[in-house]
Amino acid sequence: NQNSLKEIFMIGVRNPQGMALSPQGEIFITNHGAKGGDFLGKIKGGENYGWDKIGWGGTNYSGTKIGDGESFSEKFKSPILSWVPSIAPSDLVFYSGEEFLDWNGDILITSLKYKFLLKLEIDKGEIIDKEIIFKDEIGRLRDVDINSKGEIFIITDEKKSAIWKLKSNTN
């Protein structure tokens, strides 16, 4: 929109938590819905995901409909993946490294609510496989990062969280 402020990159998200660049330089986010309607999406300048007109399958915490009650609409950008019930996605990262060679290019997403690390295998921009790497083992997962060797580090949102390091069984 020509009348938009230049400072506004995009609109229509409720509570974006994680953001990462794909190997192709595209921007991806995780977004909290209300009661359901969390999503993984690709963003570009000027786009609108539709919050608070649509709820991506979720409802308000009170149980009432979001906006006009539509989950999705052709008027707005659609997410790549949405979750109902909510998983409370927090962070995401595209894997690149030597520690988990088969994971190169895959997306890793942390979940606060279900306390899991999710791996999404991507091929030509499409999700072709989903795998929960671990669940309910260390707490509510807040952040994930990868060092230059490809080692994966995770932190929870607990006050005295340790930094957890994932290791491959093959290395």
Feature annotation, model-predicted:
Residues D143-N171:
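Blade-level signature of beta-propeller repeat domains, shared across WD40, Kelch, NHL, RCC1
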Residues N1-E131, G139, K149, S161, ...:
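Beta-propeller domain segments
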Residues K135:
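Short glycine-rich catalytic loops that host catalytic nucleophiles or stabilize transition states
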